[in-house]
């Protein structure tokens, strides 16, 4: 059985050497592995959240598509498409929006960061916050769930959004009484290559220290490598290879044998000028053929458009049947005679309280207690492994709710086991609201214990 892996490509900005080594190259290599059904999409709807310059969005879409294709992405082997070419994504986004609690979106890091920044400025909490930013995690969930991806490689800053996608999928499955969606696994690339920039810090446009991937051609690459900051050791003086970010750049693009030979040359006194020339030549050996292909693609956007349209058609063959099924599930299907409707399997008559587990962005494991209507009633403390979290969930079900759940102060409550606080409830507006939530949480635990 193949593992479906979905990778989203942000369509803002022009890729640099660090993007290639840290994301593009490893993702393309992974797509060639046996048993991998790889999906790659240009996340151009997401780009509108951050950028309102149409020319920049359009140019970035072209550059990103050309870059990935030039770097070796095989559209015959993978499914490569543009987000905006799949109308089923936005339809699914609305279906998911209708089952997603606002409280879940309130906890999204990007939204909370905007609120915190506004607080620091002394302006309204939601000043400048668009619905695109606020509901971004729902669109991301639609991207993933539409194709029932098994794995989604992300950076640590996106882990929360993957957990939200799982939560939303569980809510929908539970509400409509069937496993419509696979729960995607978060794949954090712990060994992602982080290249140093010209000044030794992480290569980033924010630091203005990037080395271009294709922009500026061979001359641009040579100019950038000549501007790499080095120490003051003269030719003939031994160099400390491990302390040199120039050596780290060379190592990221060379074989082990080449890397060892370059290291010896540095330790034997190779001058920095010669070292920069050697780095340029090694990079150019890899990048020149890709750059040639990139220039060819950029000058022929119609070819890229054809590739993306073929990918979109391939993706929609999978998306359309699922959306038809979902329409039927929520009552938006084709009108049928009463007899035909009666023959359809009945939806679950009632919803139940439930525990849902998730992995936090720091790698720890937690769980939530959700009411039948999806409202969060408890969130656990972090655990080192899922087994510990699961054991505590079972213990909470076995405990008398009145003993396990107690008021913490006037506006909050917590779950206690063995004299320790193991989970906490949401903060209420006042003592009355706290008591109502506490009663609801106790009722949910009692319901689980009786199940």
UniProtKB/Swiss-Prot annotation:
Catalysed conversion reaction: tRNA(Trp) + L-tryptophan + ATP = L-tryptophyl-tRNA(Trp) + AMP + diphosphate + H(+)
Motif ('HIGH' region): 11-19
Principal location listed in the UniProt entry: cytoplasm
Gene3D superfamilies cross-referenced by the UniProt entry: 2.30.29.80, HUPs, Tyrosyl-Transfer RNA Synthetase
GO MF annotations, alphabetized: ATP binding; tryptophan-tRNA ligase activity
Amino-acid positions noted as binding ATP in the UniProt annotation, renumbered to this chain: 10-12, 18-19, 155-157, 195, 202-206
Coiled-coil region(s): none
Subcellular location as annotated: Cytoplasm
Keywords: Aminoacyl-tRNA synthetase, ATP-binding, Cytoplasm, Ligase, Nucleotide-binding, Protein biosynthesis
Motif 'KMSKS' region, chain ranges: 202-206
Quaternary structure annotation from Swiss-Prot or TrEMBL: Homodimer.
Protein role: Catalyzes the attachment of tryptophan to tRNA(Trp).
Family label: Belongs to the class-I aminoacyl-tRNA synthetase family.
Name under which the protein is recorded: Tryptophan--tRNA ligase
Highest classification ranks of the organism: Bacteria, Pseudomonadati, Pseudomonadota, Betaproteobacteria, Burkholderiales
Gene this chain is encoded by: trpS
């Amino acid at each position: 059985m193949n593992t479906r892996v979905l990778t989203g490509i942000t369509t803002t900005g022009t890729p640099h050497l660090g993007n290639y080594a840290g994301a593009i190259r490893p993702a393309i290599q992974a797509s060639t592995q046996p048993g991998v059904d790889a999906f790659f999409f240009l996340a151009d709807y997401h780009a509108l959240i951050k950028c309102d310059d149409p020319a920049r969005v359009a140019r970035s879409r072209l550059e990103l598509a050309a870059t990935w294709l030039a770097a070796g992405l095989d559209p015959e082997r993978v499914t490569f498409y543009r987000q905006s070419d799949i109308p089923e994504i936005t339809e699914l986004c609305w279906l998911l929006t209708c089952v997603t609690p606002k409280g879940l979106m309130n906890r999204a890091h990007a939204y909370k960061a905007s609120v915190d920044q506004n607080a620091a400025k002394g302006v309204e909490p939601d000043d400048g916050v668009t619905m695109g930013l606020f509901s971004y995690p729902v669109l991301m969930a639609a991207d993933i769930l539409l194709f029932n991806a098994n794995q989604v490689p992300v950076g640590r800053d996106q882990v929360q959004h993957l957990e939200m996608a799982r939560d939303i999928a569980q809510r929908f499955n539970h509400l409509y009484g069937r496993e419509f969606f696979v729960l995607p696994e978060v794949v954090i690339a712990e060994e992602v290559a982080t290249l140093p920039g010209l000044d030794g810090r992480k290569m980033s446009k924010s630091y203005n220290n990037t080395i271009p991937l294709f922009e500026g051609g061979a001359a641009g690459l040579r100019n950038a490598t000549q501007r790499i900051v080095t120490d003051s050791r003269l030719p003939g003086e031994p160099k400390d290879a491990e302390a040199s970010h120039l050596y780290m750049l060379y190592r990221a693009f060379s074989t082990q044998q080449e890397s060892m030979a370059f290291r010896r040359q540095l330790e034997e006194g190779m001058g920095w000028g010669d070292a920069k020339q050697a780095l340029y030549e090694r990079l150019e050996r890899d990048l020149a053929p890709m750059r040639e292909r990139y220039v060819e693609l950029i000058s022929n956007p119609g070819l890229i458009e054809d590739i993306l349209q073929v990918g979109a058609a391939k993706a929609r063959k999978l998306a359309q049947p699922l959306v038809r099924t979902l329409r039927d599930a929520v009552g938006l299907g084709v009108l049928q005679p009463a007899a035909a409707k009666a023959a359809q399997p009945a939806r679950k008559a009632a919803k139940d309280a439930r525990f849902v587990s998730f992995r936090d962005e720091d790698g720890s494991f937690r769980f939530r207690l959700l009411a039948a209507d999806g409202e969060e009633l408890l969130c656990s403390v972090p655990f080192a492994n899922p087994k510990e979290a699961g054991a505590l969930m079972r213990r909470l079900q076995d405990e008398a709710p009145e003993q396990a759940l107690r008021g913490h102060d006037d506006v909050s409550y917590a779950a206690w086991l063995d004299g320790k606080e193991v989970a906490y409830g949401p903060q209420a507006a006042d003592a009355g609201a706290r008591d109502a939530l506490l009663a609801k949480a106790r009722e949910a635990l009692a319901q689980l214990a009786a199940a």
